[in-house]
A protein has these predicted regions:
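Domain-level recognition of nuclease-like catalytic cores that cleave nucleotide substrates
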Residues: 491, 495-523
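Phosphate-binding site recognition
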Residues: 1-424, 439-440
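Active-site metal-binding core of divalent-cation-utilizing nuclease and nuclease-like domains
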Residues: 136-141, 435-462, 509
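Metal-dependent nuclease catalytic cores in nucleic-acid-processing enzymes
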Residues: 176-183, 337-345, 431-437, 482-502
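Structural motif
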Residues: 146, 464-466, 500
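Conserved catalytic cores of phosphodiester-cleaving nucleases, focusing on short active-site segments
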Residues: 432, 455-472, 486
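Mg2+/Mn2+-dependent nuclease catalytic core
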Residues: 167-171, 472-489
Length: 523
């Protein structure tokens, strides 16, 4: 029997079911939310994580389309199948807009619904038009109205760092959403999704009863593909990929886990895989980076610069209280809320005694994608050549040929033009960290603390630990001598692995060419 086609790029539940495409059953979550306390709910998850599909699933459910749910969990749970009027607004295309464009976008969204409900002479103001829509739908059907808003925050994502523009767009959105409070008696269910969490007062100033389910344990697996769903529902897909890759089932599952797993949106939580990447991997029969290819995180790069957040910090686990990362992005004082809510870091552990969460990059796909996105900001040119150099270095390091690998790096640096704003040690340290972090087969730690001081870069392979010190304006010999005088290598004496000390240096010649050098020493 032929496998079902994957719904890559499709986010309409009705179409997926009618065309009999592959579907991970999330309808139990839909039923649970529809039959719990409260009317208005909010969920934030990273992009391409299934939020739009979830909303269209809810749309079909609240419209009473029982035939679409045959064989799914909700078929046995729901007894009444009442049809409600549904107003579905998609804000996902409202990006990169000035205020006038956003107001026209609101107009288009409202006009589509007004045509459906036969409203021919709408008012001018968006909030008045939404009130009219709710009242008309209620009057025409005699039933409370369901409102579904997809990617509510899309118009704001690119202007989080622009206070004046942010406030202007936020005011327009506040006006648009304001009827949700006044029309509360006419509403059966309201559900909003987005990537980031903006403060309730900034957009929903009148709506004080939103239930945020984003970190609620019962909804931990509402979006994405859990490990249980993968192993129990997609075994044939894993086996087909294993055959293509000439690997065992267990080896293939391990590779999928390393590349696409690792997300947790509360604790405890099931392991959650990135659904877009996982399904694309199965469709293409190739393990690759797919999530970054579907969108460039320009707003994230801008915010990292604004907060002076260094690439090296991404490689470290971070400890934080819930309010430090599950916070409103427009008032954040660190980059952590944006990194977490956008899916670049995720929850890895929780300490009940301190109430602190441990957060880190979820998987290899995110780590590689992030560092590749950051590389051009440290190397304004030669990025493609750098990626080629990194790939060749990885092979040599795996073979234990560290000197040959660093010779490649030396040759690369000779091609990089010098810029005045790079005349400091930190720039080269961060650039080198990105380069080494992209050596994805190895464990990289930057500024590792020991009892003797801080090691600039530590690289660990299957059988070797490289202890590296970087100097600017000094010699590689001086860098190597610091490793020895500070006894940095002592921290790894019990590792059972070979230890190699590497001193590295950068110098700028009179003709403004960059000179990279190194000296290595085995213990």
């Amino acid at each position: 029997m032929a496998r079902k086609l994957y719904p890559i790029g499709l986010q309409t539940f009705e179409r997926i079911r009618v065309e009999d495409k592959f579907y991970i059953d999330k309808t139990e979550y839909v039923y649970r939310m529809a039959h719990t306390d409260g009317t208005c709910f909010f969920l934030n998850r990273p992009r391409r994580f299934g939020k739009s599909l979830l909303l269209t699933t809810m749309k079909s459910y609240f419209e009473g389309k029982k035939e679409l749910f045959k064989g799914l969990a909700i078929e046995k749970l729901e007894k009444d199948w009442i049809s409600y009027p549904v107003l579905h607004f998609d804000m996902s295309m409202g990006k990169h807009m000035e205020i006038a464009q956003l107001e026209r976008y609101f107009d288009q969204q409202l006009a589509e619904q007004e045509q459906k409900w036969g409203i021919t002479n709408p008012a001018v103001d968006a909030n008045v038009r939404l009130i009219s829509l709710i009242q008309t739908a209620y009057r025409e059907t005699g039933k409370q109205v369901v409102i579904l808003i997809d990617e509510y925050d899309a118009p704001l994502l690119d202007v989080v760092h622009e206070d004046e523009k942010l406030e202007e767009l936020r005011n327009a959105m506040r006006n648009f959403y304001s009827p949700l409070k006044g029309c509360e008696k006419l509403l059966r269910f309201v559900f909003l999704t987005g990537i980031t969490k903006f403060s309730q007062l900034s957009i929903f100033s009148e709506l004080n009863n939103i239930t945020n389910i984003s970190m609620d344990e019962p909804y931990a697996g509402i979006c994405g593909i859990t490990e249980d769903e993968l192993v129990n529902g997609m075994r044939d897909d894993i086996e087909a990929l294993a055959e293509k890759l000439n690997l065992s089932y267990e080896q293939t599952l391990a590779k999928l886990k390393d590349n696409y797993d690792g997300y947790h949106f509360t604790w405890p939580s099931p392991d959650v895989y990135n659904p877009f990447s996982l399904l694309t991997c199965f469709a293409k029969q190739k393990i690759d980076s797919y999530w970054f290819g579907s969108g460039t995180p320009s707003y994230l790069i801008n915010m990292m610069r604004n907060f002076n957040f260094l690439p090296a910090n991404l490689g470290e686990s971070m400890e934080a209280g819930k309010d430090d990362f599950d916070a409103a992005t427009e008032t954040m004082t660190t980059i952590m809320p944006l990194l977490y809510q956008s899916g670049y870091i995720t929850i890895k552990d929780y300490d009940e005694e301190t109430e602190l969460y441990t957060l880190a990059i979820p998987n290899k796909e995110i780590r590689v994608g992030l560092y590749r996105s950051l590389l051009p900001h440290y190397l304004t040119s030669k990025t493609a050549m750098c990626n080629t150099t990194i790939a060749k270095m990885s092979v040599l390091i795996k073979q234990g040929k560290i000197d040959e690998a660093l010779q490649l790096l030396k040759s690369f640096w000779e091609t990089v033009p010098y810029c005045n704003n790079t005349h400091y040690e930190g720039h080269y340290q961060q650039t080198m960290y990105i380069i080494f972090a992209l050596l994805t087969n190895f464990r990289i730690i930057v500024e590792q603390h020991t009892s003797k001081g801080r090691i600039d870069i530590t690289m660990e392979t299957d059988d070797t630990i490289y202890v590296m010190e970087l100097k600017f304006g000094k010699t590689a010999q001086e860098a190597l001598e610091q490793i020895e005088s500070k006894h940095y290598a002592d921290a790894f004496a019990m590792s059972g692995k070979e230890i190699i000390k590497v001193g590295m240096s950068f110098n700028i010649k009179d003709d403004n060419t960059i000179v990279f050098d190194w000296k290595s020493s085995e213990i």
